[in-house]
C-alpha cells in the first residue's frame, strides 16, 4: 500500500547515508494468465528494480511476466532445469535434504540479481541507487536476440518488454562499477494533469490518442504515468506511451481482467 511505497522512497533517498539502498522486486509468475508486471504496484515503483526471469538458454521462462517497468532479467528455471540452492537443514525444509535443485520462478531470479548488485557495492561502496540501475542498463546482455520484442530506444539502448535491458551480467556490471563516476543529481519533473474526454472504440483495431506536451529537454531514466480511466472492462484496454522518437512503452496490455476502471493507477516505464 501507500506506506510501503513511501518506505521504498525513503530507503532510496535516506539509506546508506544518502547514497540509497537498492530494492529488487520479482516481476511475477503470472504470464500463463496474461498478467503483466506493470499491474504490480511494488514492481511499478521507480525505487525498485523489477526483475524477470529467463531459462538457462536465455529465453523467457514460461511464467515470467513482461512489462515496461522491467529493468533486467536473471536466470531461473523454466525449461526443465531448476536452480540449485541451500535449504533449511533437515526435514523441516522444502526437501528432506539440505539443498534443493528445483528452485525457480522470478522469486529465484530476483535474489540472483540482488547478489550481483551486492558484488557491485563491494567493488564500489560509493555507488548510489541510481548508479546501480544505470550500470545494469549499460552492462546487461541482449539475450534471445531474435525475439521480436527487442527495440532500440531513443538513447540507443536495446530494450524489451520481455527482458528489460537484457540478462544481468555479473562480470560486466562489477567491472563497470569499479571505476564508475556517479550520476549527476536527479531532476524530477511533474506534468499534468492531462484531461481528455475520449470515447474508446469497442471491438475494433482503432485507437483513441491524445498528445502530451513536455517543455523540458531531459535525459530520462524512468517515467511514472498516473492513469485514471472510466471503463466497465479494463482488461479490454491497451495503454501505450509513445516517445517523440517512436519508442513505445506498453503500460497495459489487454487480458482477461474483468474489473472496471483504472483509478489513479501509477504505471512505470524504464
Locations of regions flagged by a protein language model:
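Loop and turn regions of beta-sandwich accessory domains that flank beta-strands and are enriched
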Residues: 177-270
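Short loop/turn segments at connectors of secondary-structure elements within structured domains
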Residues: 17-19, 79, 126, 219-221, ...
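Residue-level detector of functionally special positions within alpha-helical transmembrane segments
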Residues: 28, 105-107, 164, 169
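Acidic, glycine-rich active-site loops and adjacent beta-strand->loop/helix elements
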Residues: 27-30, 138-142, 255-257
Amino acid at each position: 500500500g501507500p506506506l510501503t511505497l513511501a518506505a521504498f522512497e525513503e530507503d532510496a533517498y535516506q539509506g546508506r547515508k544518502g547514497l540509497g539502498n537498492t530494492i529488487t522486486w520479482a516481476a511475477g509468475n503470472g504470464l500463463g494468465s496474461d498478467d503483466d508486471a506493470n499491474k504490480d504496484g511494488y514492481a511499478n515503483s521507480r525505487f525498485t528494480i523489477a526483475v524477470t526471469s529467463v531459462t538457462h538458454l536465455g529465453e523467457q521462462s514460461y511464467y515470467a511476466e513482461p512489462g515496461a517497468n522491467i529493468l533486467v532479467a536473471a536466470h531461473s528455471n523454466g525449461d526443465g532445469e531448476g536452480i540449485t540452492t541451500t535449504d533449511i537443514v533437515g526435514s523441516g525444509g522444502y526437501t528432506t535434504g539440505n539443498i534443493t535443485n528445483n528452485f525457480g520462478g522470478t522469486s529465484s531470479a530476483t535474489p540472483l540479481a540482488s547478489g550481483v548488485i551486492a558484488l557491485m557495492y563491494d567493488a564500489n561502496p560509493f555507488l548510489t541507487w541510481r548508479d546501480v540501475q544505470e550500470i545494469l542498463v549499460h552492462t546487461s546482455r541482449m539475450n534471445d536476440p531474435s525475439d521480436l520484442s527487442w527495440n532500440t530506444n531513443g538513447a540507443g539502448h536495446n530494450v524489451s518488454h520481455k527482458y528489460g535491458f537484457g540478462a544481468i551480467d555479473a562480470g560486466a556490471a562489477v567491472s563497470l562499477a569499479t571505476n564508475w563516476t556517479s550520476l549527476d543529481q536527479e531532476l524530477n519533473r511533474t506534468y499534468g494533469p492531462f484531461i481528455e474526454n475520449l470515447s474508446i472504440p469497442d471491438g475494433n483495431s482503432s485507437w483513441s490518442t491524445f498528445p502530451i506536451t513536455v517543455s523540458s529537454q531531459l535525459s530520462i531514466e524512468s517515467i511514472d504515468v498516473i492513469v485514471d480511466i472510466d471503463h466497465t472492462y479494463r482488461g479490454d484496454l491497451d495503454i501505450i506511451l509513445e516517445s517523440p522518437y517512436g519508442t513505445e512503452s506498453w503500460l497495459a496490455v489487454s487480458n482477461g481482467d474483468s474489473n472496471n476502471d483504472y483509478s489513479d493507477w501509477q504505471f512505470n516505464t524504464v
